[in-house]
Amino acid sequence: MSGEASTPAQDPSVEPLDAAPVAAEPEVMSTETPAEGSLTDPAERLQQLEHELQTLKQEHETLQSQYMRIAADFDNFRKRQSRDQEDIRQQLVCSTLSEILPVVDNFERARQQLNPESEEAQALHRSYQGLYKQLVDVLKQQGVARMEVVGQLFDPTLHEAVLREESTEQPEDVVIEELQRGYHLNGKVLRHALVKVSMGPGPSADAEGAASAEAEDS
């Protein structure tokens, strides 16, 4: 019937009396915190930053010191390795050259003792002398130099005294004869020279000299 009143179910704008109330949405609290500087006194913040800066400076100095130590250790290691390699090289060179020197001695003895007379012997002698000269030139190129010892004061760092004898020509402790040639290698002793050393004129010569002086005075 058109005259009937509308019921709540028929009118959507009217809420039913038994309807459950709608819960209100909870208020969301902000999780954002204010900036740290807004809660800290500027003087305290400055002090904190200065402390952090000082700590960083100390750490930097420590790392710098460690770096310098490591760099110095590495440099010393490199120099030590270089010296060791040079020492090994010098030892090998000295060992090799020391084995060659007796060959040079034999050439020099042959040169002094042999006196070839025939043309064939002279040709052979010249051939040997050519080899000797080449050998000496090679030694010079390697830094080997002969010692000059006769007339020099005896020096145990350079000479090895094999004989001692009286001499009226040279004073005591002066080298009067070279028995085996000595050599230097780049300024260092490669082989000591074997020498004969003067003992001076001796007591008999001194007595004769004193007697002669007395005779002249009388």
Swiss-Prot record:
Asked if the Swiss-Prot or TrEMBL record annotates the protein with the keyword Cytoplasm, the reply is yes
Compositional bias ranges of the Polar residues kind: 1-10
InterPro entries tied to this protein: GrpE, GrpE_coiled_coil, GrpE_head
The record ties this protein, via Pfam families, to: GrpE
Q: Which domain of life is it from?
A: Bacteria
Checking Gene3D superfamilies in the record gives:
3.90.20.20, Head domain of nucleotide exchange factor GrpE
Q: What keywords sit in the KW lines?
A: Chaperone, Cytoplasm, Stress response
Output compositional bias ranges, type Low complexity.
200-218
Keyword Zinc-finger carried by entry: no
Gene Ontology CC annotation, any one: cytoplasm
Q: Name one GO molecular function term.
A: unfolded protein binding
GO annotation terms (biological process): protein folding
The compartments listed are: Cytoplasm
Task: Tell me the segments the record calls region Disordered.
Answer: 1-44, 198-218
Summarize the subunit comment: Homodimer.
Q: What does this protein do?
A: Participates actively in the response to hyperosmotic and heat shock by preventing the aggregation of stress-denatured proteins, in association with DnaK and GrpE. It is the nucleotide exchange factor for DnaK and may function as a thermosensor. Unfolded proteins bind initially to DnaJ; upon interaction with the DnaJ-bound protein, DnaK hydrolyzes its bound ATP, resulting in the formation of a stable complex. GrpE releases ADP from DnaK; ATP binding to DnaK triggers the release of the substrate protein, thus completing the reaction cycle.
NCBIfam families in UniProt:
PRK14143.1
Q: Which family does it belong to?
A: Belongs to the GrpE family.
Question: What is this protein identified as?
Answer: Protein GrpE
* Lineage summary: Bacteria, Bacillati, Cyanobacteriota, Cyanophyceae, Synechococcales
